[in-house]
């Protein structure tokens, strides 16, 4: 968005679809290019980016990638969309440094997190939060030993 706003040859923006919709030609039968999910329950990150950039009447604050609450690996970085000024980002009780990299777009460097962590963004009166499980949450559990049948049947 930063490069597009400064380009004198760029003169318009179009949104292809407001909502995801069913499509026979697409994998899983869904065209996922919309700003809102097919069940209309969740707004995608692009929705909040456009809202932060274009809606000057209602301030916006949004932590991106909130739908992915299970995260593998301890190093995590966060992106925030805010039209209410520079946000303060808290990971548990720690404050994370936030830098603006484009209009209404902020990010943090990677930080080391572990376990269940609540991430909170604060910008003026606005609040947004997400609870993440970070670490080796995606690895399958190991079995204690080989499985044995209680009464094995003899085979021929």
Where are these regions (language model features)?
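Extended substrate-binding grooves/exosites of carbohydrate-active enzymes
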Residues: 1-96, 107-112, 116-126, 150-152
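Compositionally biased low-complexity segments at domain edges in trafficked proteins
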Residues: 145-156
């Amino acid at each position: 968005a930063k490069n597009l706003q400064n380009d004198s040859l760029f003169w318009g923006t179009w949104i292809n679809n407001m909502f995801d919709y069913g499509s026979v030609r697409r994998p899983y039968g869904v065209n996922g290019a919309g700003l809102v999910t097919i069940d209309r329950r969740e707004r995608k990150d692009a929705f909040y980016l456009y809202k932060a950039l274009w809606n000057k009447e209602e301030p916006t604050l949004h932590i991106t990638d909130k739908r992915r609450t299970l995260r593998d690996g301890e190093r995590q970085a966060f992106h925030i969309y805010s039209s209410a000024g520079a946000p303060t980002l808290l990971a548990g009780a720690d404050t994370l440094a936030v830098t603006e990299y484009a209009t209404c777009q902020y990010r943090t460097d990677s930080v080391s997190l572990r376990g269940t962590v609540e991430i909170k963004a604060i910008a003026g009166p606005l609040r947004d939060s997400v609870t993440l499980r970070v670490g080796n949450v995606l690895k399958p559990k190991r079995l204690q030993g080989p499985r044995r049948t209680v009464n094995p049947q003899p085979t021929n």
